């Protein structure tokens, strides 16, 4: 994906949400787990909240409160978009130096196990870390991962 453009952030966020491994070992180290959980919840619930907030005012014939209910509906609809936006920004953020070293160690460990990977990135981003973590949890056994988790 591209890291420029308004709509690409949402697309990158959705892709990153699908790529990030939902493992309990990662939850204390990264906020992604909580953001992904909240975003998935918002995708399911917030459209209903938006519709209910407008329909209740229409059913009770309260036209004076209709503008406020529309604002509430717009806010409710924006909640999942905010999650996708945050995830898209996070996916395209370059890793800090400590995580770059961890990324390289994991990459090397996966290569040593005999798995094929795309070439090592010199300036990896969080989406690259998500891909490597996915591969590590699928390819490596628990003893190889004990050092990090």
Curated annotation (Swiss-Prot):
It is a multi-pass membrane protein. InterPro entries: UPF0208. Keywords: Cell inner membrane, Cell membrane, Membrane, Transmembrane, Transmembrane helix. The chain crosses the membrane at residues 41-61, 69-89. It comes from the Bacteria. It is found in: Cell inner membrane. GO terms for cellular component: plasma membrane. Belongs to the UPF0208 family. This is UPF0208 membrane protein VSAL_I2111.
């Amino acid at each position: 994906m591209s890291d420029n453009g308004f709509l690409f952030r949402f697309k990158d966020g959705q892709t990153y949400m699908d790529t990030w491994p939902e493992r309990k070992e990662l939850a204390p180290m990264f906020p992604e787990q909580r953001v992904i959980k909240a975003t998935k919840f918002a995708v399911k619930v917030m459209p209903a909240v938006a519709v209910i907030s407008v329909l209740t005012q229409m059913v009770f014939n309260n036209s004076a409160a209709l503008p406020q209910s529309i604002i509430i509906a717009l806010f409710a609809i924006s909640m999942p978009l905010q999650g996708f936006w945050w995830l898209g920004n996070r996916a395209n953020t370059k890793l800090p130096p400590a995580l770059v070293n961890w990324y390289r160690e994991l990459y090397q460990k996966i290569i040593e196990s005999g798995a094929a990977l795309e070439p090592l990135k010199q300036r990896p981003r969080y989406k690259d870390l998500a891909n490597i973590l996915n591969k590590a949890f699928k390819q490596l056994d628990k003893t190889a991962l004990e050092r990090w988790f």
